[in-house]
Amino acid sequence: MKNLISELLLRLAQKEEESKELVAQVEALEIIVTAMLRNMAQNEQQKLIHQVEDALDGVKPDASVPDYDTELLRQYVKKLLRHPRS
């Protein structure tokens, strides 16, 4: 029983570490996108935003991807492009 608990705690710690790494990657990408947008002329920003939104509109998600996940991604991309981090 102790071995099972130890193994479960180890797996939980590994999952937590993986989660921290993913959060760090997302935050780094947010910073990069924000910096890039801020250094672009307004018309270039708008052009990029429209290109990304058009690309998303043209993508059909796999049937195994829940609609909620697809909508969450779309909302997050829109938020990031239209209202970048401060």
Curated annotation (Swiss-Prot):
Gene name, per UniProt, is iraP
Name the protein family: Belongs to the IraP family.
Residue runs in coiled coils:
1-36
Taxonomic superkingdom: Bacteria
Q: Which GO BP terms, alphabetically?
A: cellular response to starvation
Q: Which key words tag this protein in UniProt?
A: Coiled coil, Cytoplasm, Stress response
Official protein name in the record = Anti-adapter protein IraP
Where it sits in the cell: the answer is: Cytoplasm
Described by its record, this protein's role is as follows: Inhibits RpoS proteolysis by regulating RssB activity, thereby increasing the stability of the sigma stress factor RpoS especially during phosphate starvation, but also in stationary phase and during nitrogen starvation. Its effect on RpoS stability is due to its interaction with RssB, which probably blocks the interaction of RssB with RpoS, and the consequent delivery of the RssB-RpoS complex to the ClpXP protein degradation pathway.
Q: What is its main location?
A: cytoplasm
Q: Which InterPro entries match?
A: SigmaS_Anti-adapt_IraP
Query: Would you name any one GO CC term?
Result: cytoplasm
Q: Subunit comment for this entry? A: Interacts with RssB.
